[in-house]
Each structure stands twice: as structure tokens, then as C-alpha cells.
Amino acid sequence: MLLGSHVSMSGKKMLEGSAIEAHEYGETTFMIYTGAPQNTRRKSIEDLNITKGHEVMEKYGLSNIVVHAPYIINIANTTKPETFNLGVDFLQQEIERTQAIGAKDIVLHPGAHVGAGVDAGINKIIEGLNEVLTNDNNVRIALETMAGKGTEIGRSFEELARIIDGVHNNERLSVCFDTCHTHDAGYNVKEDFDGVLNEFDKIIGVDRIKVVHVNDSKNDRGAQKDRHENIGFGYIGFDALNYIVHHDSFKDIPKILETPYVGEDKKNKKPPYKLEIEMLKQQQFDPELKNKVMQQ
């Protein structure tokens, strides 16, 4: 089963360090940012330590890794040309890094229309993706299902479908299905996941889903908040998330945890991924998980 989490990529070890961290959590795949998600400072491809990273991945059976584009990219912005242009240029660079790392998909938040309206935002995203996807490689951009916070685009399957339909080279577009986001956007992920998936299949096609973000939610369905919770401790619950992780439709695609670190003290938070992954593999909820994470 391809199950992993977001891991860090930093220091001198870069991809090698990411692979070691993922292995320590008992993962078979993982997701990384190529640098800080809040800025454009990036190391050169030569400094990403890719060869050693691949050696560690092969040693420990890690594959199908995923890259996440930084949050600062907003190609839905119609009011500031510099924001749009930065997004297009930087996304192209990130795709080059993604290809060098050997990942097939780079996850992208479609963007926010910042008050110009959904139609204007979608048209701008299409314009940006048409520009970006002229470059010659086989990396897919995985558009993420969004919670609908603020002016986010991608809160409904229909919005994502409109983007995909408008992009010329759309065989290079995939979808990242985020459980927390779709729940927060109003879809009944908890009680009727197969119904949600059938709806997705009719509107977009389930074969477009190439990444799943597995997150519980701190909020009730339809809250449009996007606040992740640890597996089984939120409003979606363990049974629904366990069902999704083991779903036949997602058998061969990476399932990535982005659940929050545990701990009241901001300086002493600990990653939950090792124990959350064990829990999902055993298909048994552990109500003591958070306490056990802090005792690690």
C-alpha cells in the first residue's frame, strides 16, 4: 500500500534526509516541498542530493513520491499581474525540480480569485496552466480539491472540471483529492464516500485522481475552514478515513497524511505519522494515539 506523509526536505541531506525520515515512519511513499512553502528561495537542482535520495528510496522500498507546490503561487489572481507572472514562472521552475527528483505529480492549490469572482479566477488559472504546460516534460499538475475558504477556487468538482476542460494539454492535469477539504467544502465524505466518488467520477473521472491527502477535520461538514486534525480525532472519523485509505480506487496511488504535529507546547510538537500509519495499516483506531506520540 502506498501510504506516507509530508516530510521535510532541508539541510545538506535534502532528498536523502526526506527518504530517511519517511522510512523511520514506516512509510512506502512521501510528499515534499522543494523549499519553504511561503517563499521562492530554492537550492539548485544539483544541491537537492537526488542520487543519494534515490539510493535510500530503493533500499527501503519508497516510491511514487509527490511534490507540493508552494502556497505563494496564485495563478488565479486577475488584479496583480506581477502575482500571476510570478506564479507561472515559479511553477515552471518547480515542475523542472519535480522532474529532476523523479516525482510524477506536483500538487497545486488552484488559486484564489481575491474578489474578482469565480469565473474570472478560473479563466486566469486556465491561462496560467496553458502557459506552464507548454514546457516539455511528463510531470502532471495535480489540482487539489479545496475547502472553499475565502475566495479559493476548487471548492467543487465542477470548478475543477471547468479548469481541466479549458486547458489544451490537459492530459498533464490530475487531481489531488483531500479528505479534509472535500468534507469542509460540504461533501459527505464521512457517511457516503462512495456516493462522493461516484459524483466525482461523473463530473471529472475518478481516473484523474493521482494523489490522496488523508486528513481528518477540526470542523463540521461544510464549514469551509480547512483545519486538519489527526486521524480519528476529527469530524470525519477513523472509520471513514480507514475506508478511504483501503479503497480499491486508490490502491495504486500515493495516500499522504498532512495531519498536525501533536503537543500543546509549540516548541515541543511531535510528528504523529509513524503511529497514524501503524493505526491505518492495522485498521484499528487507538484513542491513546496523541498521548503515545508525546511519549515517543
From Swiss-Prot:
SUPFAM superfamilies in the record = Xylose isomerase-like (SSF51658)
The positions annotated for binding Zn(2+) 3 are 181, 226, 228
Keywords from the UniProt entry? DNA damage, DNA repair, Endonuclease, Hydrolase, Metal-binding, Nuclease, Zinc
InterPro entries on file? AP_endonuc_2, AP_endonuc_F2_Zn_BS, Xyl_isomerase-like_sf, Xyl_isomerase-like_TIM-brl
Q: Which Gene3D superfamilies match?
A: Divalent-metal-dependent TIM barrel enzymes
Q: Per its UniProt entry, which superkingdom is the organism in? A: Bacteria
- Biological-process GO terms, alphabetical: base-excision repair
Residues the record lists as binding Zn(2+) 2: 144, 178, 213, 258
Record CDD domains: AP2Ec
Q: How, per the record, is the cofactor bound?
A: Binds 3 Zn(2+) ions.
Which PROSITE patterns does the protein's record reference? AP_NUCLEASE_F2_1, AP_NUCLEASE_F2_2, AP_NUCLEASE_F2_3, AP_NUCLEASE_F2_4
- A molecular function (GO) term: DNA binding
Question: Which cofactors does it use?
Answer: Zn(2+)
Extract the PANTHER family matched here: APURINIC-APYRIMIDINIC ENDONUCLEASE (PTHR21445:SF0), ENDONUCLEASE IV ENDODEOXYRIBONUCLEASE IV (PTHR21445)
The job of this chain, per UniProt, is described as: Endonuclease IV plays a role in DNA repair. It cleaves phosphodiester bonds at apurinic or apyrimidinic (AP) sites, generating a 3'-hydroxyl group and a 5'-terminal sugar phosphate.
**Stated name of the protein:** Probable endonuclease 4
Organism whose genome encodes this protein: Staphylococcus aureus (strain NCTC 8325 / PS 47)
The upper taxonomy is: Bacteria, Bacillati, Bacillota, Bacilli, Bacillales
